[in-house]
């Protein structure tokens, strides 16, 4: 999203869907990113915001932060079971994953082979919608509300899996004014949709994912320049003894700093931290999910090196292209 953020002529745009594009589905489920909550002022009851999504036109809502709590639990297990791969690197930010593929291939074995929270939430949301409605899966639209173009790119060109479980993507900045106009009505009769606590909602900010790992042996960095410096040091094996987990976010302050959000990222980060005092620690547990299988949330395809800096497969082919 840096090119969108810095282009002086505003010539760059994001490939995304709009509310009018969702008419092709018989039933739609909104997947609000954890960063959505911090875009609004004085909303202490998240159910007001989630109810507003149903007033906008969605049939149901499933929090991505609920998927994040499942991924946090699976991450803790994987980190504890694979000390030989420490430090493991988060794969929640698609920009980081792609950066490692093209520039730091030696770190690929350290990538945490888990689906990102939005995909985990999409799997769970679709199962619930099928059970609730009896509709075929292709009649149900799973719609992600995204804070950044990187996650949109992941949905169209996923890594670690063949096809995304998400059918459409709306930008938070597009849905924001529509939601704002429905907040007063939602406040009158909020419906309970909340499925997550601090651990899930904390993924919106830098350090939030590491908070869910429940370990002191982690490193968290945000901002693409800082991330590159950390990756260079990791490649040179310059890291703290006992380091288990590395959380990296391309956007400053974390996902709240995405180019498709509306609030100042540091104000949004402060809002997330303030909201923690009103939240339980955790809502979702793997053991509570019917027919839960950890392998459903693991990579199904390997992520491999992508040499974008070479002209050809060998030196002769490269010379011909010069």
Which role does the model predict for each range below?
Residues 1-13, 17:
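Long, contiguous juxta-domain segments that are non-catalytic but functionally important
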């Amino acid at each position: 999203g840096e090119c969108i953020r810095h282009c002086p002529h505003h010539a760059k745009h994001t490939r995304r869907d709009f509310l009018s594009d969702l008419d092709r589905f018989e039933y739609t489920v909104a997947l609000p990113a954890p960063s959505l909550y911090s875009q609004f002022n004085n909303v202490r009851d998240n159910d007001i915001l989630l109810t507003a999504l149903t007033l906008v036109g969605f049939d149901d809502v499933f929090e991505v932060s609920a998927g994040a709590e499942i991924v946090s639990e699976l991450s803790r297990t994987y980190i504890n079971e694979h000390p030989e791969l420490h430090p493991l690197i988060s794969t929640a930010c698609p920009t980081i994953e792609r950066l490692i593929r093209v520039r730091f291939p030696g770190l690929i074995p350290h990538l945490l082979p888990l689906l990102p929270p939005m995909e985990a939430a999409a799997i769970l949301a679709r199962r619930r919608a099928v059970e609730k409605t009896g509709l075929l899966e292709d009649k149900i639209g799973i719609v992600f509300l995204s804070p950044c173009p990187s996650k949109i790119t992941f949905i169209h060109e996923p890594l670690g899996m063949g096809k995304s479980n998400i059918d459409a993507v709306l930008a938070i900045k597009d849905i924001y004014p529509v939601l704002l106009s429905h907040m007063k009505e939602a406040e009158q009769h909020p419906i309970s949709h909340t499925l997550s606590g601090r651990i899930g909602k904390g993924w919106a900010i830098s350090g939030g994912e590491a908070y869910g790992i429940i370990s002191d042996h982690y490193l968290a960095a945000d901002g693409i320049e800082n991330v590159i410096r950390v990756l260079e040091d990791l490649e040179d094996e310059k890291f703290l003894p006992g380091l288990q987990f590395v959380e990296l976010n391309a956007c400053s302050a974390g996902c709240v700093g995405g180019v498709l959000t509306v609030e100042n990222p540091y104000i949004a980060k402060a809002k997330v931290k303030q909201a923690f005092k009103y939240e339980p620690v955790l809502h979702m547990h793997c053991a509570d999910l019917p027919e839960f299988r950890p392998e459903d949330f693991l990579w199904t395809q390997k992520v491999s090196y992508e040499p974008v800096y070479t002209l050809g497969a060998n030196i002769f082919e490269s010379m011909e292209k010069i």
